[in-house]
């Protein structure tokens, strides 16, 4: 039996759900759904126009529906009123082949059929930049090779600690935090 998201929301005081999927460019797409509507969304899915989310579709295609996976529920540590859900995309009664999650599931199944196990994970990387996006956030970071620099790391300690604490609370089990600084133009070349 599937988990009842409405009951879970009431027990955990979740007011909204982010029903989410990833497009072909790796952008997370979502709809914010109030808890009162989650029962219907859990059954029928949240409607999206696939062409508007960079999936291989046109405006003439039917809407697709993101059916949330209750086992993926993460109550956001920085906003406990919100529960995040991964979803599977369906259109016209069939899985959407252009969905990265569907592609991954197919690959996992294919490998299992060959007696293999796929292991995957997330490397959480992010950039700390100024509010206007013009410079790195730490203007004291002037080293040519700043990776692993303790002074730089500790100047950003409060923010890095908050991010790491949230990952721990979500059950992601991070095992270290480090600081690596690089020019964004250099990163696009690598």
Predicted regions and their residues:
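Single conserved hydrophobic/aromatic residue that forms the stacking wall/gate
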Residues: 180-190
């Amino acid at each position: 039996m599937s988990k009842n998201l409405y009951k879970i929301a009431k027990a955990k005081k979740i007011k909204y759900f982010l029903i989410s999927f990833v497009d072909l460019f790796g952008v997370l797409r979502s709809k914010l759904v109030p808890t009162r509507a989650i029962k219907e969304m859990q059954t029928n899915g949240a409607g999206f126009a696939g062409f508007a989310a960079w999936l291989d579709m046109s405006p003439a295609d039917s809407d697709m529906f993101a059916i949330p996976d209750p086992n993926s529920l993460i109550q956001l540590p920085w906003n406990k009123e919100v529960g995040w859900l991964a979803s599977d995309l369906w259109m016209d009664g069939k899985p959407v082949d252009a969905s990265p999650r569907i592609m991954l599931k197919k690959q996992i199944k294919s490998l299992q059929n060959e007696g293999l196990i796929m292991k995957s994970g997330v490397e959480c990387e992010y950039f700390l930049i100024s509010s206007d996006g013009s410079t790195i956030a730490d203007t004291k970071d002037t080293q040519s090779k700043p990776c692993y620099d303790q002074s730089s790391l500790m100047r950003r300690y409060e923010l890095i600690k908050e991010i790491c604490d949230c990952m721990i609370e979500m059950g992601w089990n991070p095992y270290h935090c480090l600081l690596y600084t690089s020019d964004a133009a250099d990163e696009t070349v690598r």
